[in-house]
UniProtKB/Swiss-Prot annotation:
Stated name of the protein: 2,3-bisphosphoglycerate-dependent phosphoglycerate mutase
Physiological role: Catalyzes the interconversion of 2-phosphoglycerate and 3-phosphoglycerate.
NCBIfam families in alphabetical order: pgm_1, PRK14115.1, PRK14117.1
Record pathway: Carbohydrate degradation; glycolysis; pyruvate from D-glyceraldehyde 3-phosphate: step 3/5
Highest taxon of source: Bacteria
Chain positions recorded as substrate binding sites: 8-15, 21-22, 60, 87-90, 98, 114-115, 183-184
Disulfides per UniProt: none
PANTHER family, alphabetized: PHOSPHOGLYCERATE MUTASE (PTHR11931)
Reaction equations catalysed: (2R)-2-phosphoglycerate = (2R)-3-phosphoglycerate
Gene: gpmA
Species for this entry: Streptococcus sanguinis (strain SK36)
Lineage of the species this protein comes from: Bacteria, Bacillati, Bacillota, Bacilli, Lactobacillales
């Protein structure tokens, strides 16, 4: 059976500060760095050997991927980066403290923005310091593709082509795959893999640690799902 390991990035500096992060390129905290290393140690203990790795274009996921591969003695494994694995874009909430946002907009509204499947948060201004429209890493993309805000539905729509074009074919070829990504891009793919309803995915949380493992048969039916070390 082939294995797919999802590792959400370790705690970031903005996770630590309770800020909405989204596409802002925030670094790992000291705790997050250790979580990434510990993820790699769990992978090594489990004897999982990868053939291919994928990650986003955000440093917290890239570093988590590299640290986990290094700690599992697999730093040589090819890594492909894609914006399609980025975190959900939190729009105008980016950089805001979650508690302060609740005070400003109300607990219920912020909860809807965070947890609903298809409600968009406010758009980010194009001149915002965190706007992806002026970020060089997205220069090859058509400007119309770059989001100003996303919900989980939109996140799945842009992550799904990467699943279909890259991850699923690798698994079908018998390759074990590592994906170092983000809470919501992983949630989106888990929704697709498990065929969860829009309501069911609302209750799914992806922790910074430990990694989540799916084992598939040759037709990519899920045979087993578990968290490493649990």
């Amino acid at each position: 059976m082939v294995k797919l390991v999802f590792a959400r990035h370790g705690e970031s500096e903005w996770n630590k500060a309770n800020l909405f992060t989204g596409w802002a390129d925030v670094d790992l905290s000291e705790k997050g760095t250790q979580q990434a290393i510990d993820a790699g140690k769990l992978i090594k203990e489990a004897g999982i050997e990868f053939d291919q790795a994928y990650t986003s274009v955000l440093k917290r996921a890239i570093k988590t991927t590299n640290l986990a591969l290094e700690a599992s003695d697999q730093l040589w494994v090819p890594v492909e980066k894609s914006w399609r694995l980025n975190e959900r874009h939190y729009g105008g909430l980016t950089g805001k403290n979650k508690a302060e946002a609740a005070e400003q907009f109300g607990d219920e509204q912020v909860h809807i923005w965070r947890r609903s499947y298809d409600v968009l948060p406010p758009n980010m201004d194009r001149d915002d310091e965190h706007s992806a429209h002026t970020d060089r890493r997205y220069a090859s993309l058509d400007d119309s593709v770059i989001p100003d805000a996303e919900n989980l539905k939109v996140t799945l729509e842009r992550a799904l082509p990467f699943w279909e074009d890259k991850i699923a074919p690798a698994l079908k070829d018998g390759k074990n795959v590592f994906v170092g990504a983000h809470g919501n891009s992983i949630r989106a793919l888990v929704k697709h893999i498990k065929q969860l309803s829009d309501d069911e995915i609302m209750d799914v949380e992806i922790p910074n640690f430990p990694p989540l493992v799916f084992e598939f048969d040759e037709k990519l039916n899920v045979v087993k799902e578990y968290y490493l070390g649990k």
